[in-house]
């Protein structure tokens, strides 16, 4: 009928799941937001209520008021503290990642992940993963997962060795 009505709703003020405005920019808030996507279905371009790697980061950082570009390769070059990992050995990359804050983005060609931290000197990330290689064949995953960076690409190198940059957006 073309009439717009204004409607008020009552939201509990002490509900920890509700925040007025953006959440404070902290590693904990980034990780809490990311973990809400754990096991969500992978879908290229975020089709049909799914998330791909870049939409995961886009959605997580949006909760703290940072609007990232939509695509992983563009997110890699967005303003912030960017650490170049190219040309580093695996051990050097682990040292650099150990100096990064949880919630930093980890970029490699055509993929981006959210850094969680290290366990026994092994870096871990949460990311929306379509597949990886194991025992010489493609392993379908198709969901948001937590993994170390020992996962293999089709060329036989690990995700750790494919990393190009660690990015802390500001």
Task: State what each model feature region is.
Residues 1-87, 109, 126:
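N-terminal capping segments
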Residues 31-35, 83, 94-97, 160-164:
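Generic detector of well-ordered alpha-helical segments enriched in charged/polar residues
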Residues 4-5, 9, 19-20, 115-170:
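Aromatic- and glycine-rich peptidoglycan recognition patches
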Residues 49-52, 73-74, 91, 121, ...:
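Acidic-enriched, low-complexity/disordered segments with a strong bias for Aspartate over Glutamate
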Residues 69-136:
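...with weaker cross-activation on analogous glycine-rich loops/strands in unrelated enzymes
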């Amino acid at each position: 009928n073309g009439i717009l009505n204004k409607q008020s709703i009552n939201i509990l003020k002490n509900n920890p799941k509700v925040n007025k405005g953006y959440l404070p920019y902290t590693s904990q808030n980034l990780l809490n937001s990311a973990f809400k996507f754990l096991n969500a279905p992978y879908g290229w371009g975020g089709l049909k209520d799914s998330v791909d790697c870049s939409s995961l980061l886009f959605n997580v950082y949006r909760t703290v008021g940072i609007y990232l570009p939509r695509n992983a390769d563009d997110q890699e070059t967005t303003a912030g503290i960017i650490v170049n990992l190219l040309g580093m050995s695996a051990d050097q990359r682990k040292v650099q990642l150990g100096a990064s804050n949880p919630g930093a983005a980890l970029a490699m060609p055509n993929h981006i992940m959210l850094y969680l931290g290290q366990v026994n000197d092994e870096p871990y990330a949460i990311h929306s993963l379509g597949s990886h290689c194991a025992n010489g064949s493609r392993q379908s995953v198709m969901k948001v997962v937590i993994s170390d960076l020992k996962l293999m690409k089709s060329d036989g190198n690990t995700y750790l060795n494919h990393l190009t940059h660690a990015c802390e957006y500001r």
